A protein has these predicted regions:
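Short hydrophobic beta-strand element within catalytic cores of glycosyltransferases
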Residues: 301-304, 308
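Membrane-proximal helix-turn-helix segments that form the acceptor-binding/catalytic region
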Residues: 137-156
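Nucleotide-activated donor-binding/catalytic signature segment of Leloir-type glycosyltransferases, i.e.
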Residues: 242-264
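Carbohydrate-associated surface elements
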Residues: 162, 184
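Conserved acidic donor-binding segment of nucleotide-sugar-dependent glycosyltransferases
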Residues: 316-332, 341-346
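Short alpha-helical donor nucleotide-sugar binding micro-motif in glycosyltransferases
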Residues: 263-264, 271-276
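Aromatic "clamp/platform" in nucleotide-sugar-dependent glycosyltransferases that forms part
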Residues: 284
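Conserved donor-binding/catalytic core segment of Leloir-type glycosyltransferases
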Residues: 157, 191-210, 216-221, 230
């Protein structure tokens, strides 16, 4: 379970934007995050989010002290568990602590006792049991562990309104303790594309949850069309799935048109987006979908599965236009049909591109994310309490 360096200027809000949040001096929040958060070979939306808010929170009154927690979260070995326990134990009483849920939610025996003396908030990028391909017993155990952690802390932060609703209903949390801080987006130059239609792009780690096999099946059904596709994302999370995907690509005879490039970052990733005509995302589960807003920030339309928080990420242009198409999950035929429509109907392309440019202008920046997080941290109770 589980991107690359982002080029941007950290948020510098005015006092008026920040009314009621900025104190006379910076307060400290201790941010406990996965040990691989800076690893360019293992990019993820969660890692990118964590890194970005570390740089933007000071603009909203919070100095961030980072604590990397090495380990195979949410299934840590003894050394990782001991390391996390030591990190939390060494923090002073009443310290404000933001915990990445990938680290925190699987180890209630470590986190819950610390909620008695620390002011804890847990940032949930993806509910642990929602990872695709888990054994039912493993998913149930992770679910139970996560529930114990989230019920013990005074604040839970999710990355979409959909995720807030899911956490409240699934774990029986008090709605006033679950907050949204959706990822922001950096507006980038409009993508020139390739020819306006044929270059497809999927930016996602190659894992069962991202469902690239469904993309392969859909592309095989429209092999008569002149498309090329790049799947950009880490290949090290699930080598077995990557091998299966390569076999599938070869079986369909698509190897010369569909490439698994591995992760890209910086100028290479920017160039990849600049050449794209359509973003395609075939996930089984997403709490938001940062790759979608990264595409829309460049005016690239989106074709994605209608799951989780993806509809929020796609959103609408100010005039109500949809900058993307949402298809039912588990339906490669519907995906193929929409691809055929994209290629065959110029009016569809024009409409989607116009809406994508409108949505681009309306996207919230990362300052909105940092402001939301700062507000949650500011409101953490002075004395930790047990939360039901």
């Amino acid at each position: 379970m589980q991107r690359a360096r982002l080029a941007y200027v950290p948020a510098q809000p005015t006092a008026a934007e920040n009314a009621g949040i900025i104190p006379m001096s910076l307060r400290t929040v201790h941010f406990v995050m996965p040990g691989g958060v800076d690893d360019p070979a293992a990019p993820s939306g969660g890692n990118a989010y964590d890194r970005r808010v570390c740089l933007d929170l000071p603009g909203f009154g919070w100095q961030v002290t980072r604590h990397a927690a090495p380990g195979t979260w949410p299934h840590p070995d003894r050394a990782a568990r001991d390391g996390l326990a030591r990190t939390l134990r060494d923090l002073p009483d009443d310290a404000v602590v933001l915990l990445d849920g990938l680290v925190a939610c699987g180890v209630p025996e470590i986190v819950v006792p610390e909620a008695e003396r620390l002011r804890l908030a847990v940032l949930v990028h993806l509910p642990l049991g929602d990872e695709t391909g888990l054994d039912a017993a493993v998913a149930a155990d992770l679910d139970t562990r996560e529930r114990a952690v989230l019920r013990a802390v005074p604040a839970v932060i999710a990355t979409s309104d959909w995720a807030v609703r899911r956490l409240v209903s699934h774990h029986g949390l008090a709605p006033d303790r679950v907050h949204v801080a959706a990822p922001g987006a950096d507006i980038a130059p409009l993508a020139a594309g390739t020819d306006g239609v044929s270059r497809l792009l999927c930016v996602a780690a190659v894992t069962p949850r991202k469902g690239q096999h469904r993309l392969v099946e859909a592309l095989a059904a429209v092999r008569d069309l002149p498309w090329t596709c790049e799947c950009v994302g880490g290949l090290g999370h699930d080598p077995g799935y990557v091998a299966h995907l390569r076999t599938l690509i070869d079986q369909y005879g698509l190897a010369d048109r569909l490439r698994l490039t591995g992760p890209r970052s910086g100028a290479d990733l920017d160039a990849t987006y600049a050449a794209a005509d359509l973003m395609v995302l075939t996930s089984y589960a997403e709490t938001y979908g940062m790759a979608v807003t990264e595409a829309l920030a460049r005016g690239i339309p989106v074709l994605a599965t209608d799951v989780g928080g993806l509809p929020e990420a796609v959103g609408r242009a100010p005039d109500g236009g949809m900058p993307g198409i949402l298809v039912p999950p588990e339906d490669p035929a519907a995906l193929a049909a929409e691809l055929r429509g994209w290629f065959g109907e110029p009016d569809v392309r024009r409409r989607l591109k116009a809406a994508a440019r409108g949505r681009r202008a309306a996207l919230d920046g990362w300052a909105t994310t940092a402001r939301s997080l700062a507000g949650v941290l500011q409101r953490l109770p002075e004395a930790p309490r047990s939360a039901a």
